């Protein structure tokens, strides 16, 4: 009887929710909303980010804007001041085919020990460029290094070159340093016993938000410690350190790139999108009457949208070399190009699209996305081919060679 009743309720819900509810609009003459969702949606739509890139800036205004972006990033990332922590410690060194694999631990907070892997090419005879490698959702430093996970249930597809970012770099002659994202890989909780690589990022993110921090703030703080350690190693060229992020890893890449101007170049392996707009246009309810939210709470940073969006941050990296491997809307990518052109180094930005959208005529080319989208419709409009989302060494290694040799 309960199952029958549930089916009836579901059917009634489906009938009640018509296509007119995909667009958020007030039914009142004064434009106000009774629905709280309508209220907050309108509030978000009215936000103009303080640090939005303006293509008509002068060179001096551009430099001042970069400083404003950096200061704003410092404010919202909320890195703690921690002193007198122990120095990082090497746990082991093992020989692999063509490179040495080291494991290190470091102590970023009084409550925390974290680990990273270092891949050092056998061909090394003098200091060489080094790449900090940050995995995507569900990934681990072991997968990036071509190693089994710390437990069988945590194994990535670690022999697949579309996964082994750090190993690919080491094989090409660069030092590669691989980290875990918080709550994943070796930094996970009970996943190794049951749910495997379906990591519970959200639990950690909730607690960090309650502490007045954020998942991205915590992630970037840890990654910054590893970046600073890299600068102290005699076999690494400190003027040629690159940050490479895959998917989720592009977010700490943007933070590190904004805060540390000594980073030489960036590998952005994901599509670029305007995240505030993404939240505004994905409004289509499902059959149960539930509207989507673009991302989980591990992507939420208080005040982020009041400051900037992803294209603004990538634009602020100019004129340092950057490669974007999975496209997005030309509107957003052109904004990045404009920043590099403004600095006189347009050649320092290289942009690729998914092969499915390599032909400009196959891409959506609009100035503003329409409201009323579900997740699949959004991805289609922003030129994303999710089945081919992987680390694109075939594009990145030639680009590195061009900028490093």
Residue ranges and their predicted role:
Residues 75, 79-126, 130:
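N-terminal cap/lid segment of alpha/beta-hydrolase-fold proteins
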Residues 203, 207-210, 264-314, 319, ...:
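Mobile cap/lid helix-loop segments that gate and shape the active-site cleft of serine hydrolases
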Residues 12-75, 375-383, 393, 397-399:
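N-terminal pre-domain segments of enzymes
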Residues 319-326, 350-352:
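Catalytic His-Asp charge-relay segment
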Residues 126, 132-221, 231, 279-282:
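Cap/lid segment of the alpha/beta-hydrolase catalytic domain
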Residues 235-247:
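Alpha/beta-hydrolase fold nucleophile elbow
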Residues 342-405:
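C-terminal catalytic histidine-bearing segment of alpha/beta-hydrolase fold enzymes
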Residues 250-261:
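Short glycine-enriched nucleophile-adjacent loop
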